[in-house]
Amino acid sequence: MKYISIIIVTLLFLQCSEKNNQLNEKRITVDLEERTETSVFDLMDSITVVPLESSDSCLISTIHQIEKKNDTLYIYDMQQSSFFCYKTNGDFLFKISDKGSGPEEYQYIEHFSVSETGEIFLLEPWGNIYHYGNNGIFIQKIKLPNVLKSYNEIYVRRNSIVINSLSGDILYFSLPDGTYQSFHLYERMNIFFPLKRTSVYNDSIMNVSLFDNQIYKIGQDGLASSWAWDFKENNNSEKDIKRLTNEIEYKSGDNHNSVMTDYIGKGKPLRQFIYTSCESNRFKIALMEHDNNFLHVFHDKSNKMNRVFTRTKENTIFHTCTYSDNTFIYFNQPFVKGWRDLTCITKEVLGEKYNLYKNIIDDYDSNPVVILFHLKK
């Protein structure tokens, strides 16, 4: 009887421990005031400077969007309406340049997505998708149902397509049979756009809410709560959001040219704002605005430790990078300007690779420079 009691107590303890672990995974608690001195190399396994092959057949004007899948880079150049595919060592693979008015030609590409197998999906803002194989050969044109005001972002996983609209609506579309569901995400609130808030992790398409730090998984049944950031006293309250709504309504009626940072920080409606939330094999990451500055939050899933910092020891920020496939991707963005220091690349970060980086950016005949920050696994 004594041994049975011990077994029961042990089982109950294990069940409670498992439940606590599940709760901890559902809510990541972070003290934004507790800063950690962090080096890029505390987070990254390695850094790659990619010298994109430059020839008459593959010259890029500007990089509008870039994605990485395994050892392949996918780049859309809006100025040329062309799509380029490279190996991560810089070798050119192929180019898609099918702008026109024919049945297999696109007029304007708003966004693109690449499947797990390397198939390419180019999205027009009025609801057409141009589907290409992993060799750049055209497969089909897909006409989406007319249920969104605009079609602004596309994300593909397995046989499912998710489309985000500037209006705050979502279309979930099945590739095999064309069935679909549409859902309302949240209202666009002036300068707080419901775009660039979606990321892909493994087989899941995830979205971060505008103000309450919730991370949702997008599926055929709509939004399912997955987990949340908890910034304790720095969480935005309902009162904060109400104040934000009132100020935006007041200023919009006065032709006020406001920017996001007018509403975030000390003495302003919002205590913090997540620009991007993404997840890698090892980290859960939030790139934020807090206390009138950029802020990084890296939660290490392997040891449950948090790193909170404004800049790395090497004076780097990742807010101007794109996240894709366990990698932060930096590329020259001449149109990105601001009153803050947006430095990402320094000598301390690149070390002996800095000369290669400088040679690329100083060569006016070469393609834009791309740098890959490979996160630890």
Show which residues each predicted segment covers:
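Conserved blade-ending motifs and adjacent loop-strand segments that build the rim/top face
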Residues: A228-K242, K301-D325
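Short beta-strand elements that form the blades of beta-propeller/WD-repeat-like
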Residues: T29, T72-D77, G118-E124, N159-L166, ...
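Beta-strand-rich domains and repeat architectures in extracellular enzymes and scaffolds
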Residues: I47-S81
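Blade-loop segments of beta-propeller domains
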Residues: E53-C58, D91-T117, E124
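Short coil/turn segments at the loop-to-beta-strand junctions that recur within blades
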Residues: D56, S97-E105, L144-S150, Y186-I191, ...
